[in-house]
């Protein structure tokens, strides 16, 4: 996986007013944390983060270049750990970066991508995907963009488990092998209607009369 360059600078304030000023200038607050850097508050370009997420994804390897107002810039190898967004607007609030070493293995989540056409779907079945990511461990440069799940051999009642997936070279699955990834279930049958009752209704009881 290629390394993406991203410029950042130390954060110069805090609070709602500061965040609003960042937004007006096309910036968002961020933080990078790790063994060497500790915790460093930053601000980065919103569009640059959007481009990384759109073109490369959350597992992009990032060389974060922190440029202070004075002194030399410092570079940190990192991945995006979390993205905080508005609950219903496509608007970034905050980005968390995690400093990594390119020489050390890490554990991360990788998206699953279904490929092929399942014969069971043609027969009327329904394909149900139970998980959309798997945990993997590998060197940062070996993080795959996605893991393919070929469903072209699935008939009704069949399933694919994590143990059935093929891991790329240098990648190990950490998700339990017994976990079901996708299953092909039979179509739902319409419930049979209860047969209508036939015959004459029993006569209503005659009320008692006094003697």
From Swiss-Prot:
The keyword Membrane does not apply. Residues 188-211 are annotated as: Disordered. GO terms for biological process: translation. InterPro entries: Rbsml_bL25/Gln-tRNA_synth_N, Ribosomal_bL25/Gln-tRNA_synth, Ribosomal_bL25_b-dom, Ribosomal_bL25_C, Ribosomal_bL25_long, Ribosomal_L25_dom, Ribosomal_uL5_bac-type. Gene3D superfamilies: Ribosomal protein L25, beta domain (2.170.120.20), Ribosomal Protein L25, Chain P (2.40.240.10). GO terms for cellular component: cytosolic large ribosomal subunit. The keyword Cell division does not apply. Residues 200-211 have a biased composition (Low complexity). GO terms for molecular function: 5S rRNA binding; structural constituent of ribosome. It comes from the Bacteria. Keywords: Ribonucleoprotein, Ribosomal protein, RNA-binding, rRNA-binding. Part of the 50S ribosomal subunit; part of the 5S rRNA/L5/L18/L25 subcomplex. Contacts the 5S rRNA. Binds to the 5S rRNA independently of L5 and L18. Belongs to the bacterial ribosomal protein bL25 family. CTC subfamily. This is one of the proteins that binds to the 5S RNA in the ribosome where it forms part of the central protuberance. This is Large ribosomal subunit protein bL25. It comes from Desulforudis audaxviator (strain MP104C). The gene is rplY.
